[in-house]
A protein has these predicted regions:
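Active-site region of glycoside hydrolase catalytic domains
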Residues: 259, 263-395, 404-424, 449-452
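Aromatic-rich peripheral "rim/lid" segments of glycoside hydrolase catalytic domains that contact
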Residues: 429-512
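A short beta-strand micro-motif common to beta-rich folds, especially ectodomain repeats
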Residues: 95-107
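Bacterial Sec-dependent N-terminal signal peptides
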Residues: 6, 13-41, 105-106, 111-129
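An active-site-proximal structural segment forming one wall of the substrate-binding cleft
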Residues: 133, 171-191, 206-237, 241-287, ...
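Acidic/histidine-rich helix-loop elements
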Residues: 153-175, 203-209, 257, 373-398
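Surface-exposed binding patches on compact interaction domains or structured appendages
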Residues: 34-35, 57-85
């Protein structure tokens, strides 16, 4: 019996000596080489990466990470001398983070120290977004300079009542040559002439535009030409909220709808292009206005797999094809191409510029009323870093960021950009008006800084508050409301070349 006990004890000791690292001998040691690792201290960059570690062990060890959510170990087949990988995910924080990896074999333990650097962040200086940008020399900068200070003849030829466009339907008197001469005298250099064609388009398949309306549009364009102004003509409220014939929502819903609407769209643009084929390069065509499904970029376009975006891009291509095919000066005319809803972000993300037989003759058209609760709805009284009383929740930086993104995407690549609409409604007190003036001067100076041509929205409204954006009388060309304060400030913002006058100087002189 005693001999049997000795044999059992000897066998047990032998088994313990060759067992896995997780089992200890009576003396607490294991057979084979001692557990070791190199290096013991790991320092990794903020990006997701791996680092190799050489491990020597008598048998397969266990690995325990103190931060397994971002620091893990990859180990292959065991060998007494092997290589493992310590893996880290991206550290999106600016702060470094630390973890430890324990390598355990029996009662032996080696600890690896893991440090991952934080994401490198360039400290933002308060004046960085106000820095002066050296004007470029490419086509984008050249065209923006040519357009200069723009203005909209809004709520005029785009006005409509019960589905019929009428120049005086929304309260403005008939435009005259004096209107455009007055604009020129005040420093305006370009005019956007929105045109609604509702009620003036005949039946399929010709879709003939009635002569009286077409001739009136041509007459107003002639006013701009005679005054020496650049001009933009478009199809405006025909696509408003997808309520009328130029409905992006219906066109995206079926092939039949798309084909029917596109046929009318092409027919209308063929007639417009032919009417103005002999006009010089002062005239720019813009295919449509703010096309969306009625939800201003927050509707079905977010879930339809890009169907509405594709329609907008396809219509832009059809527009270019039709205009170029009419010949004359249209073969090389500048054409403005809006993205979905004319929203800058949606345009950057989804606009596909049409193929064009004329090189460098396409402009990108976007609108910007940021923040709209201040500029259009008048829910806030003041805006910017100096605002105190009922201030808008966003300030100058987001506005500049919009322009920076447009510059990076388009202007730096030689593609001109213009804000077909921008502005800020009139206010009722002198202090509120001073912030309105500051917003507009800052916005327009930023446009000049980033090489973007801005067109002020003017709807002729002389009251104050929501949607009241009258600065110049649409019939006489004289100032109305506080236009005598606003327009000279915008002229200064766009054309002042004194070194002391900068975006930062405008910022520093905000109302207090």
């Amino acid at each position: 019996m005693k001999t049997l006990k000795h044999k059992i004890l000897a066998t047990a000791v032998m088994l313990m000596a060759v067992s896995a690292c997780g089992k200890e001998s009576n003396s607490g040691s294991v057979t084979g080489p001692a557990l070791s690792a190199s290096p013991l201290e790991l320092v990794l960059e903020s990006a997701a990466s791996s680092q190799e570690v050489n491990v020597t062990a008598p048998s397969k060890p266990n690995f325990v990470s103190s931060a397994s959510d971002w620091c893990t170990v990859t180990a292959g087949a065991f060998a007494q001398k092997s290589v493992i990988k310590v893996n880290v995910t991206e550290n999106q924080s600016a702060e470094e983070r630390k973890a430890s990896v324990s390598i355990v074999c029996g009662d032996e333990r080696v600890r690896l120290s893991v440090t991952q650097k934080g994401r490198e962040v360039t400290p933002e200086q308060p004046e960085d977004f106000l820095a002066e940008i050296e004007p470029g020399t490419n086509n984008a900068w050249t065209v923006a300079k040519k357009l200069g200070l723009g203005w909209n003849l809004g709520n005029q030829l785009d006005a409509q009542n019960n589905g019929v466009a009428s120049e005086t339907a929304w309260g403005n008197a008939t435009a005259t040559q004096a209107t455009f001469d007055g604009l020129k005298a005040k420093g305006i250099t370009a005019v956007r002439i929105p045109v609604t064609w509702l009620g003036h388009i005949g039946a399929a398949p010709e879709y003939k535009i009635d002569d009286a309306w077409m001739n009136r549009v041509a007459e107003v364009v002639g006013y701009a030409e005679k005054a020496g102004l650049m001009a933009i003509v478009n199809i405006h409220h025909d696509g408003a909220d997808s309520k009328y014939w130029l409905s992006v929502k219906r066109a995206a819903s079926s092939s039949a709808e798309y084909q029917a609407i596109t046929a009318e769209f092409k027919a209308v643009w063929k007639q417009i292009a032919e009417k103005f084929a002999d006009k010089g390069d002062f005239l720019i065509f813009e295919p449509f206005n703010e096309l969306h499904d009625g939800s201003w970029g927050w509707g079905d376009n977010m879930t339809d797999g890009g169907a509405q975006y594709r329609v907008v891009n396809q219509w832009a291509q059809e527009f270019v094809n039709v205009v170029r095919a009419t010949g004359g000066n249209n073969a090389s005319r500048y054409l403005g191409i809006p993205g979905y809803c004319t929203n800058p972000d949606l345009t950057i993300e989804n606009l596909v510029l049409p193929k064009d037989s004329a090189e460098g003759k396409l402009l990108v058209a976007v609108h910007c009323y940021d923040p709209h609760d201040y500029t259009l709805e008048a829910k806030y009284d003041e805006w910017g870093h100096a605002a105190v009383n009922n201030p808008a929740p966003s300030d100058e930086k987001p506005v500049v960021e919009v322009m920076r993104k447009l510059k990076t995407k388009y202007i730096d690549n030689g593609i001109p950009v213009y804000f077909g609409e921008c502005g800020c409604v009139n206010r009722s007190t002198s202090r509120q008006t001073s912030f309105q003036k500051y917003y507009l001067e800052f916005f327009f100076r930023a446009c000049r800084n980033y090489g973007i041509a801005p067109f002020l929205w003017d709807n002729g409204a002389m009251d104050t508050g929501r949607e009241t954006s009258g600065f110049i009388n649409h019939s006489t060309g004289e100032y109305i409301a506080n236009g005598a304060q606003i327009i000279p400030a915008l002229k200064n913002a766009m054309f002042n070349t004194e070194k002391s006058y900068t975006l930062k100087s405008v910022y520093d002189n905000a109302p207090r």
